[in-house]
Every structure is written in C-alpha cells, then in structure tokens.
Curated annotation (Swiss-Prot):
A motif ((L)YPX(n)L motif) lies at residues 146-150, 179-184. GO terms for cellular component: host cell membrane; host multivesicular body; T=pseudo3 icosahedral viral capsid. This is Genome polyprotein. The record marks A2, D3, Q224, M225, Q470, V471, T744, V745 as: Cleavage. It comes from Human hepatitis A virus genotype IIIA (isolate GA76). The keyword Ion transport applies. Residues 34-55 are annotated as: Disordered.
Length: 808
C-alpha cells in the first residue's frame, strides 16, 4: 500500500493487484483485498452420489457413433462401414463436444467397440481395422497388420480396439484438421450365410471414446532449412550404390555436423527396425469352401509351401491383395524358414466335420493329385474338428529341403532343373464329411492366413508379385476380456539372432506377462492374446547358424542401399531443375516414388530423420553446377520443369549449397537434413495432408557454362536411409496393382536420360586424340550441317533443271 497522505494528494487509490484463475489474468491498479467468507465444505449426506463431472466422465466415455446392417448380399471385402472416428465423436449429440469445441488442439488415443448380434443359424465374419490416416493403396488382405479385431459369428460378437495417437503433427486441429487421425474400416472377411427362415442381415453398432485426452488452446466458440551433408565424388568415375557403408553421404547440407534425436511421442512408441514386423503377422492368403458334397479323402485345396502364395483379389477398388509375407519376400532372391498356415473356419453351431492338413516335402512341381487320405497320414499332418469354441488350426511347416535356401523364381519365366521356390505342397483333405441340418448352409468357408517363423531372406531385388492361380476366402473374431498389444515390432529376427539360436522362438508364449499359453496347434485367431502364441505343430531342431554376418532383413541394411528416385536431362545453359522428395502414394512415377522406394515408404505410417541422396552425372561435359536443399513451406522454383531460377544466389547459399564441376566429378553424395516443421512425414494421407505432410523437402540443381561442345548432361538420383532414420507404426503393404516401376533403361536412353552410375571411361590417348581433332576441325558439327543443306539444294536444282540430250 502507498502512503495514505500520498493517496489523498493524488486523489486515487494507489494499490495494484494481479488476480485471475487458470487462463484468465486481470491487472487492477485501484484495487482492494478480496472479500472471502467461509470455505468449501464436503457433504456428510450427499445430495448426489454420482462422481462429480470431469474430463474423464464427460470426455472419455463410450458414445454410439454408427449403426449399420451386414447383409447376405455383401460380397467378400465389401466395406460395411468407413468411419472417421474423431469427426463422428465431434458431434453436438455427445457430451465430449462440450470440451472439444472450446479447445483448438488435442492429443488422444481412441478406443472402439464393434458389436454384432448373430443367431446360431448365421455364419460368416467381419474384420474391423483401425487405419492411421487413410487406407490408400494398402492390400485389403493385409488389414490384419493394423490394430484390428475379427468377428466370427460362431466365436464372438464384439471386438474392442485401443490405439494411441499416431500423427505427423504434435496435435490434432479440431476446427481445421489436416487429415483424419484414425479411420475405422469394417469389411466382410467371410460372407454372411443364413439358415432357412433366418433374417438376411445382422445389425452392427460401433461405440467409440477418447482415451488419454489432452486438450490445448482454449478458444472462443465460433461457427464452423537449412542444409545437409554432401561428399563430392567418391572417385571420379565410380560410385557404389549397393550398400549402406558406401552409399551414405560423408558431407551434409546441414548447418552443423548434427545428429537427430529419437522421438517416439507421436508414433505410439512403435518403432520398426526389421521386416519381421510384417512377416510374423498372419495375413489373408486364400479362402476355400468345405462342402457337404465333399467325400471322405477328397482333396479340397492344394497350396504350395512358399512365402509368395496369395490368391485374394478385389474389384472395387481393383486390387491384387498381396499378403504382408509375400510383399516382403518378393523383394529378396532367396528365402528359408518355417511357414505358418492358419486355417480359420466359419461354421454355425450346427455344422460338424473334420479336415486333415498334410505337408508333402518336395517342390512346387511335384504331382500330389494321386495321394490318398491314407497315404497322407504318413507325411506330417494334423486333423482339425471344425465344431466347438476353437476356430483356428495353426499348421507350422518345418523347413525340409534339399538346399539351405530356395530361390524366388517368379522374376523369370524359364527355369532350370533344380531351381525351386517351394519346399513342397500342403494338401487339405476331407477327413470326416460335413454334416448339418437342412435349414443351414451346406458349406463352411475356411480362411487361410500365412506368416513365417525363423524367416531369413537375403539378396535384395525388386519384383511385384502376381496372384497365384487359385481362389480363396476368410473371416475372423476377437476375445476382449484382457487387452493385448497387437503387432509388436520385431518379435523375432530370423535365425540371425542369439535369441533364435537358443531356440526360444520355438516355445509357445503369450503376450501377457506371467501367463504361459498351452503349447499346441489349435487356437482362436479371433482372440489377440491367443493369436500371438508362437505356433508349434511338430517337433523341430534348432535351425542352426546363418551363413551371413549381415542381416539382410534389417530395414537399415536393406534401405541403406541406394534405390533409384528420378532422372532428368538439361537442354540449355543457365537453367535449374527442382524435384520434390514426396512420399505420397497418390503420385505416380516419374513425379512420385518409383518401385522399391514407393513400396518401402508405404509399409509404415510415419517417417522422420535425414535421407542420403546420391546424384550421378552422365555425359562428357565441363559444366559448373550447384545443388541446394529447400525445406517444405519455403520459396522454391517450379518443380519438375527446366527453367531459369527466380531465386537469388543469396537465398540459395543461405539455405546451404554445394558447388561442383562435372569434368572433375561424376557423382555427388548428399545428406538431406531432417528440417521440417512437422513431427514426421507420411506417404499414406488423405485430403490436404497429402499435399503438406507427405513431402520431405525439395532438391534443386542449377548449371552454368553449358555449351554445344558438351554432350548431353543428365542427372540420375538415388535415395537411401541413414542410421538416424526412424520408421513408426506398420501399415498394410501396397497391393500389387499400386506398385509403380520406373521407365525401362531403353526408354531413358531414347529420351537421353541414361541411368548410369559411371562417367564415360576415356583414356589419356582418347583425350589427346579428341583434342587434336577439335583443333583441326573446330566447326565440324556446323560444317556437317551446312553440307546437308548444300546437298539438299543441289538435289532440288537437279529436279527442276531440264537436262540436255545425251551426246551420241
């Protein structure tokens, strides 16, 4: 307080108080103390006995967001529902909107429940999958890679799925979202069949709630760069793109020789380092019916035992629905390991019958059509009773072969004797005939899932698999009394790790600590706890020690090899060419990622960290060049166009530039820095997110002193990942129809865009001879052109001139 006499003199109360609560502050300069009487008292006899309202009671309860009907007319893979869960929860009918509408940003997880109510006379199944961002071009048959639940009319009538916050940005903007966080897709996994007189539909309800809800940015209610690393010239004429050690950049566009720290905060903590993240997940490979007309001993299905097998297709959208296992293995020359077949049945409670599964060692060419049921019992076999609470038989085929590895024969059409892909065939027999009352369907559909244990692939290549010539079908369910984490990354790493060499991978185990699963072949794939039990169908020895000191299935080793990105040719002097590095799967080559890069960057939801770029210069030229990297969101020249640069040299060098001369170097290796305003970038986004959150950055190359004495000047660019690259949250692999290859080498030669990793080899004698010719005939090209024109004019004069009669 000021002096009382001073207050009287200035005729004002000289007291300043700062008051307020939470996000409201008031500064009062003529203030008095707060008048306060009494204090808050608890009630001895409560007026209301419910819990006081809070963020948890209001914002984290379940709300009914959707109802639908699953009809018998819905075909396999038909999308019963496609829901933007967060958008549906942001609804004035739900109490949670009272919190959300007064905040700008939020971080949250989502939990959903999908409920159906089938009768005992209905059979079939649905898959419910939570897809981050957008389904994009992912294979439908690989939806089990995502957090998912399987609904089987005979097993379960509810699934629960809980997912974390997965986003390229640190928070979700409610009023102007860049793209959806989570999309719930519900598809037919096995068609609905009904008994006589039963309803031709099953009703379906979807409940959803926020979990771990964090709200930020109170708002009034309203109506609705730098540079990286670059090594100029490995050697003048040779650059190795084959492996991580030689393909990585030793110089950087970054401001400093800096590193990027790991951050899993927006990726749900699910960091991926190894391709076994995908190969260990059972995904749908085929579907076949078990008919009442099948006789005992009849072969119902024959499947080659190789990881490339898949038969599922879809018409809307048009897809060859590759399995996750085939998607990974198609990119390698050789494979070995134990393949796991999951056979999931969709009966009613009134169907009864048995199937026998038999493995015949050999190769894909052996004839098994004459093997009888009795003969089949000699080979490794298992019998499954389709009746009861267990829906799934897990058949783990042990590695039995005459070679330590099998070869990927699908890359060519002609084969030599001894080149085999499969280690035999798996035959499905009718063991006991299917029996049922006359008022239910006379068939039971069986879904075939494929995954692998102790898988080792090596020697990378690029190949897009086609479907195997047969047919299939599938469905599933989900027990939810206990929560379990699905698809934990890198559960095991082939046979190259100490863990596998000790044989632990052969022990049945469950995801929940302290609970040991019974070891056996029968299980319930609908239950995510039981689905994670490592299969153990037959006794096996340890696989032994790998011949390779390097694990080719490591993402860092595989993608540390440089893969082709793009190529372009300059036609005139003082021009620049800019190309964005965009991960979007909606952009086709040459402006989108081609081939291996396209396949790889769509295997996961989020990418963060630097990238290494190798630029190969082709053509005998003496040209000065400059390259620079521009982070997303800044001024840049028009992409994919050869043009004069509109940017100043000050701007380019401030971003970080590298100068080079094409006579002195044939290649540049650059580390592109992770300079972004985003948490991560993604290749599978919808809407505006596909334009902003899918681009890593832009690379520009400018040339000077290019003249007619130079040959064509072409640049080819190759991309590889670094040791600081991070990949978060697995996605369903791209379906085969969406795999886009680059143009052929002959196409590029025709366009003058040679894809070459070396300069033209010229000896010292060649150079002396060329310089001698140039001195003697400095205008050779011009004189040749003049000669052509003179010959043309002479021929025209001859044709117009009347020749004199010949002399006698």
């Amino acid at each position: 307080l000021a002096d009382v006499e001073e207050e009287q003199m200035i005729q004002s109360v000289d007291r300043t108080a700062v008051t307020g609560a939470s996000y409201f502050t008031s500064v009062d300069q003529s203030s008095v103390h707060t008048a306060e009487v009494g204090s808050h008292q608890p009630e001895p006899l409560k007026t209301s006995v419910d819990k006081p309202g809070s963020k948890r009671t209001q914002g984290e309860k379940f709300f009914l967001i959707h109802s639908a009907d699953w009809l018998t007319t819905h075909a396999l893979f038909h999308e019963v529902a496609k829901l933007d869960v967060v958008k549906l929860l942001y609804n004035e009918q739900f109490a949670v909107q009272g919190l959300l509408r007064y905040h700008t940003y939020a971080r949250f997880g989502i939990e959903i429940q999908v409920q159906i109510n089938p009768t005992p006379f209905q059979q079939g199944g649905l898959i419910c999958a939570m897809v981050p961002g957008d389904q994009s071009y992912g294979s439908i048959a690989s939806l089990t890679v995502y957090p998912h639940g399987l609904l089987n009319c005979n097993i379960n009538n509810v699934v629960r799925i809980k997912v974390p916050f997965i986003y390229t940005r640190g928070a979700y903007h409610f009023k102007d979202p860049q793209y959806p966080v989570w999309e719930l897709t519900i598809r037919v996994w096995s068609e609905l069949n009904i008994g006589t007189g039963t309803s031709a539909y099953t009703s379906l309800n979807v409940l959803a709630r926020f979990t771990d809800l964090e709200l930020h940015g109170l708002t009034p209610l309203s109506t609705q760069m730098m540079r990286n690393e670059f090594r100029v010239s490995t050697t003048e004429n040779v650059v190795n793109l084959s492996n991580y050690e030689d393909a990585r950049a030793k110089m950087s566009f970054a401001l400093d020789q800096e590193d990027w720290k790991s951050d899993a905060s927006q990726g749900g903590g699910i960091k991926i380092t190894h391709f076994t993240t995908w190969t260990s997940i059972p995904t749908l490979a085929a579907q076949f019916p078990f008919n009442a007309s099948d006789s005992v001993g009849q072969q119902i299905k024959v499947i080659p035992v190789d990881p490339y097998f898949f038969q599922m297709t879809n018409t809307n959208p048009e897809q060859k629905c590759i399995t996750a296992l085939a998607s990974i293995c198609q990119m390698f020359c050789f494979w070995r390991g134990d393949l796991v077949f999951d056979f999931q049945v969709f009966p009613t409670k009134y169907h009864s019958g048995r199937l026998l599964f038999c493995f015949v060692p050999g190769n894909e060419l052996i004839d098994v059509s004459h093997i009888t049921l009795k003969q089949a019992t000699t080979a490794p076999c298992a019998v499954m009773d389709i009746t009861g609470v267990q829906s799934t038989l897990r058949f783990r085929v042990p590695w039995i072969s005459d070679t330590p590895y099998r070869v990927n024969r699908y890359t060519k059409s002609s084969h030599q004797k001894g080149e085999y892909t499969a280690i035999g065939k798996l035959i499905v027999y009718c063991y006991n005939r299917l029996t049922s009352p006359s008022n239910v369907a006379s068939h039971v559909r069986v879904n075939v899932y494929l995954s692998a244990i102790n898988l080792e692939c090596f020697a990378p290549l690029y190949h897009a698999m086609d479907v195997t010539t047969q047919v299939g079908d599938d469905s599933g369910g989900f027990s939810t009394t206990v929560s379990t984490k699905q698809n934990v990354p890198d559960p095991q790493v082939g046979i190259t790790t100490v863990k596998d060499l000790k044989g632990r991978a052969n022990q049945g185990k469950m995801d929940i600590s302290g609970v040991q699963a019974p070891v056996g072949a029968i299980t319930t794939i609908e239950d995510p706890v039981l689905a994670k039990k490592v299969p153990e169908t037959f006794p096996e020895l340890k696989p032994g020690e790998s011949r390779h000191t390097s694990d080719h299935m490591s993402i860092y080793k595989f993608m540390g090899r440089s893969h082709f990105l793009c190529t372009f040719t300059f036609n005139s002097n003082n021009k620049e060419y800019t190309f964005p590095i965009t991960l979007s799967s909606t952009s086709n080559p040459p402006h989108g990622l081609p081939a291996t890069l396209r396949w790889f960057f769509n295997l996961f939801q989020l990418y963060r960290g630097p990238l290494d770029l190798t630029i190969i210069i082709t053509g005998a030229t003496d040209v000065d060049g400059m390259a620079w990297f521009t982070p997303v969101g800044l001024a840049v020249d028009t992409p994919w166009v050869e043009k004069e640069s509109a940017l100043s040299i000050d701007y380019k060098t401030a971003l970080g530039a590298v100068r080079f001369n094409t006579r002195r170097t044939g290649n540049d290796q650059i580390r592109l820095p992770w300079y972004s305003y985003l948490y991560a970038v993604s290749g599978a986004l919808d809407g505006l997110g596909d334009k902003t959150d899918s681009t890593f950055g832009l690379v520009s190359i400018q040339i000077a002193n290019y003249n007619h004495s130079d040959e064509y000047l072409s640049f080819s660019c190759y991309l590889s990942v670094t040791e600081q690259s991070e990949f978060y949250f697995p996605r369903a692999p791209l379906n085969t129809n969406a795999m886009m290859s680059s143009e052929t080498v002959m196409d590029r030669i025709a366009l003058g865009d040679l894809e070459s990793s070396v300069d033209d080899p010229r000896t010292e004698e060649d150079r002396k001879f060329e310089s001698h010719i140039e001195k003697r005939k400095p205008y050779k090209e011009l004189r040749l052109e003049v000669g052509k024109q003179r010959l043309k004019y002479a021929q025209e004069e001859l044709s117009n001139e009347v020749l004199p009669p010949p002399r006698k």
